[in-house]
Amino acid sequence: MIICALDFETTGLDKNNDRVIELGLSLYSTGHGRFLDSVGQLVKSDVKVTPKITRITGIRQEAIDAYGYEESSAISTLFEFVNQSSAVIGHNIRSFDWPFAEKWAKRMGVILPTVEVVDTFEDIPGVEPQKLVTMMAEAGLLLADAHSALADAQGSLRLARYHGIDAVVSRSRIPTVAVQSHAPRTSDNRDNKEAKFRWNPACKIWWRAVKETDVEELARSVPFSISVLDKSVSLESLRNS
């Protein structure tokens, strides 16, 4: 199986109005147990890098102006890698990078290939979702150059390899549901935050994506009641609002 590890650095979190400024891609063969090809590219865009994004990523506008690839070239590279793969993998890729890629492709007048999406934030068996650097550290793995797109892409693959890629891919195929928290509202909402629930301002709820098979275990582990949201409320709408 060929898997494409993928990560973006962007000008912000808005998939409609922000842009990819760095692309990290790495092809991995499960049969050979090694990376086959990798690329990291800065990407030019019509949205300027802010000081805040520079503080987070280390990427400066001057570097993009001098060394960045045009968007058309960068997205061609993305397609080249994804087209060789059966699946894409990344950390929080299901909520962020892949939807960002879909919006980017649509804006460029193309459609992304259909592949499986494996998310090391959600799909690692028996491990609580956390930041990539934290999950790697708990596995005894070093993430050098965090917030470098290529380092993060390869880091997600290394994390999956540590936990068993076959097990991670299998878990990625278990349906994911949206669970709502019914914790009493407090000034700091600590219970919700500690249990990894996220606030959705459009629906005005605290929610979390959970594997269908993990709902009962989550209900036992938190000090408040939860419920599975009706399927009319899509995960995509929750993630994108």
Which residues fall in each region the model found?
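Acidic, divalent-metal-coordinating active-site segment for phosphoryl/phosphodiester hydrolysis
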Residues: 148-161
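Acidic two-metal-ion nuclease catalytic site recognized across multiple nuclease folds
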Residues: 159-241
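Short, structured loop/turn "capping" segments at alpha-beta junctions
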Residues: 112-113, 143-146, 166-172
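Conserved non-catalytic scaffold segment of RNase H-like nuclease domains
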Residues: 1-114, 129-144
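Conserved beta-strand -> loop -> alpha-helix junction used to position metal-binding or nucleic-acid-contacting
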Residues: 110-124
